[in-house]
Design a protein with these regions (language model features):
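Short hydrophobic-acidic sequence motifs that mark active-site Asp/Glu residues
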Residues: 92, 111-115
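Catalytic cores of nucleic-acid endonucleases
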Residues: 116-185
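Non-catalytic C-terminal interaction segments of nucleic acid-processing enzymes
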Residues: 169, 180-284
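Phosphate/oxyanion-binding active-site loops and adjacent basic polyanion-contact surfaces
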Residues: 53-61, 88, 148-153
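Interdomain/boundary linker segments immediately adjacent to catalytic/signaling cores
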Residues: 1-80, 261, 284
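Short, solvent-exposed loop/turn segments that connect beta-strands within catalytic domains
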Residues: 101-109
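A short acidic/basic microdomain associated with nuclease active sites
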Residues: 66-102
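A generic secondary-structure signal
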Residues: 64-68, 159-166, 193
Length: 284
């Protein structure tokens, strides 16, 4: 699971190829990951670090999910392209579970898609000894990391919607949003609504202990959930992969909906009824 050690390791690796000015903000002649809340300086967060963090967290997630994928006879693959469902070289899947270990995939080979919205969550000070020293959790600084950032949530939601509406093949693939922070109170009901509608299967935090203060660990209907350990993550993923799911969305009169339900109900068992209902929806 995500820890402060992962964040310190990121900075130690990144500083070998980047200047400190490209990784941290300068506040009162010192370098911080984020501006502390007690300071009111005008600072500019270096945009260059966003790409560095993005690449690092995508690799971290691939490593984290490697064994879980293999337990399900699948491969964890970064940067998956599948043009038929809207995953282009410009907008690939950050991570996907696939039946082959290739970046270019057919829709049938993609069994699970992850959109990764992770980042540096805590605050760090770059010391005179050229070390990165923890100086406060996310409640002590002015940044909005990971799922606490509204535009990150909106981008993840928008990409998921595009996957759902781009083709019929994209309607069968589960989508999970990965983060390493809580969500804001304003998104508690929104994430539940999105998951109930089937657009996204779950928003997940892989950071069990981001603060000792009160924070949202899960939403009322579990659309967002913080996992405590890898075993629980693996159990949830196995459950998702073992569920035969279809995304469907339609707006119609009750009479028309009732007719579809009536026709589907004539099938011999629940699975056939579900398949028939989906087929009828496609004909609308």
């Amino acid at each position: 699971m995500w820890t402060t050690d992962d964040e310190v390791r990121f900075f130690n690796d990144a500083i070998r190829l980047n200047s400190i000015e490209n990784l941290m903000v300068a506040v009162r002649n010192r370098y911080y990951a984020f501006q502390p809340k007690e300071f009111n300086e005008t600072v500019v967060t270096p945009q260059a670090r966003n790409g560095v963090i993005g690449n690092a967290t995508e690799k971290w997630c691939k490593d984290f999910f490697f064994d879980i994928a293999r337990q399900n006879n699948l491969y964890a693959v970064n940067g998956v392209i599948c043009r038929s469902i809207g995953l282009t070289p410009q907008t690939p899947a950050d991570l996907a579970f696939c039946t082959t270990n290739n970046k270019e995939q057919s829709a049938e080979n993609i069994k699970l898609i992850f959109e990764i919205k992770m980042g540096i969550v805590n605050n760090y000070l770059y010391t005179e000894q050229e070390e990165f020293s923890f100086c406060g959790d996310y409640t002590t600084h002015k940044g909005n990391p990971s799922l606490l950032r509204s535009d990150s949530m909106l981008k993840a939601i928008g990409k998921s919607v595009n996957l759902r509406v781009d083709s019929l093949a994209g309607k069968k693939i589960p989508i999970i949003i990965l983060g390493n922070s809580p969500i804001t109170r304003g998104y508690k009901d929104k994430v539940d609504c999105l998951c109930q509608s089937g657009v996204i299967q779950k928003f997940v935090s892989l950071y069990p202990n981001p603060t000792i203060r009160e924070h949202i660990k899960q939403s009322p209907k579990n659309g967002f959930e913080t996992f405590e350990n890898e075993r629980k993550v693996a159990e949830y993923i196995a459950h998702i992969l073992g569920s035969e799911m279809n995304y469907f969305s339609a707006m119609m009169h009750n009479n028309q909906l009732g007719k579809l339900i009536d026709i589907a109900s004539r099938e011999d068992n629940d699975e056939l009824k579900g398949q028939k209902f989906i087929e009828l929806l496609k004909q609308i």
